[in-house]
Every structure is written in C-alpha cells, then in structure tokens.
From Swiss-Prot:
Origin species: Persephonella marina (strain DSM 14350 / EX-H1)
A GO cellular component entry from the record: ribosome
Example of a GO biological process term: translation
Subunit structure, as described in the record: Part of the 50S ribosomal subunit. Contacts protein L20.
HAMAP family: Ribosomal_bL21
Protein name per the record: Large ribosomal subunit protein bL21
Protein keywords: Ribonucleoprotein, Ribosomal protein, RNA-binding, rRNA-binding
Length: 97
C-alpha cells in the first residue's frame, strides 16, 4: 500500500514505516500529524483519490549549507551567502483511505 501526499509545495510517495524529510511543520517532536493524501493505492490495486496519512514527528533540523556566490567582473565585487533550509523528519505510521 502506498500514498501520494503533498506538503510544503512538493509531492512524496510514502509507505507505512517510511522516514521522510519534509519542509518544516508547525508540530512538536513526538506529536502525530495528519496529512491529506491525493492518491492511495492499496494491496489489491484499488486506487482512491481521497484519504489521510498519519505521521509522527521524529525531529526538526536543518539541511546542509548551500553557498550562494555573487560576483561582478572588473568591479572587485564579491559576496558570499549561505543558507540552511529547515526540515522536519517524519515517520509514516498509517494510511487511511
């Protein structure tokens, strides 16, 4: 059984027991969150277009640093910026059709 969920402007294919990094969610560690599923396919091959996915928040963190370098030739202009995107690690517990 698997489902397709949409969170943080992205879509993910998830299965029960799977760990997944998504954009930061407003939930505390240990809380259970419900995410809308846009597509669910069960073990018999039946497809449903509505449902919910139950997930547990495992941790909050930041991804690796991404460096952004701005440069203008002949003007001695150099600028280096870094960015670390926050994420939430969730564990998929159950898929409800």
């Amino acid at each position: 059984m698997f489902a397709v969920i949409k969170t943080g402007g992205k879509q993910y294919r998830v299965e029960p027991g799977m760990l997944l990094k998504v954009e930061k969610l407003p939930a505390d560690v240990g809380e259970t969150v419900e995410i809308e599923a846009s597509l669910i396919k069960d073990d018999q091959g039946n497809i449903k277009t509505e449902g919910k996915v139950e997930a547990e928040v495992v941790e909050h963190g930041k991804h690796k640093k991404v460096l952004v370098f701005h440069f203008k030739r002949k003007k001695n202009y150099k600028k280096l910026n870094g960015h670390r995107q926050p994420y939430t690690l969730i564990k998929i517990k159950d898929i409800k059709a």
